[in-house]
């Protein structure tokens, strides 16, 4: 984190948390890292994309659904995790509207190893278009830990514009936990950029309803 001092990061996080505690909301505010880029041409330069798992789950309320074989359906039922069988998916009959609705209902999907190859055939390209193609889960992994892994993973993806924002925490985390998540995120982002720090115009952190605090 060469260019962002721990001190300025601590100050910015303290301001974000203070602002949030002074005006409590009815929901738990997410804290985002907002990134402005420079010396980048989205038309010509390669658009970067990468995911990193943070130490502390930034979005604990993220809704995850399991497309399961019998083993995972039983585990999902026992753990109160939303799930669908292959038959449930076949009933959607590749109808675009229904698949769009399914994609909107959840933030992410997990599929049993035995099912994952069938998903494109059963559902068509709908989930892929929504950027929500399922992650695979084996019988050796617990659904709960897989769900937590997905909730802890954030994706940095360059689109057509020179700014992006990524959830890096929430106001229920401690200052130290947020420093850890944000430092990790900034380092990872810079490693994805062609010219590293020379491509970073600005870095701000803000809570959902709060004011942005500049850290770079």
From Swiss-Prot:
GO terms for cellular component: cytosolic large ribosomal subunit. The lineage of its organism: Eukaryota, Metazoa, Ecdysozoa, Nematoda, Chromadorea. It comes from Caenorhabditis elegans. This is Large ribosomal subunit protein uL1. One of its GO terms (biological process) is translation. CDD domains: Ribosomal_L1. PANTHER family: RIBOSOMAL PROTEIN L7AE FAMILY MEMBER. The keyword Lipid metabolism does not apply. The keyword Ribonucleoprotein applies. Keywords: Ribonucleoprotein, Ribosomal protein. Belongs to the universal ribosomal protein uL1 family. PROSITE patterns: RIBOSOMAL_L1. It comes from the Eukaryota. Pfam families: Ribosomal_L1 (PF00687). One of its GO terms (molecular function) is RNA binding.
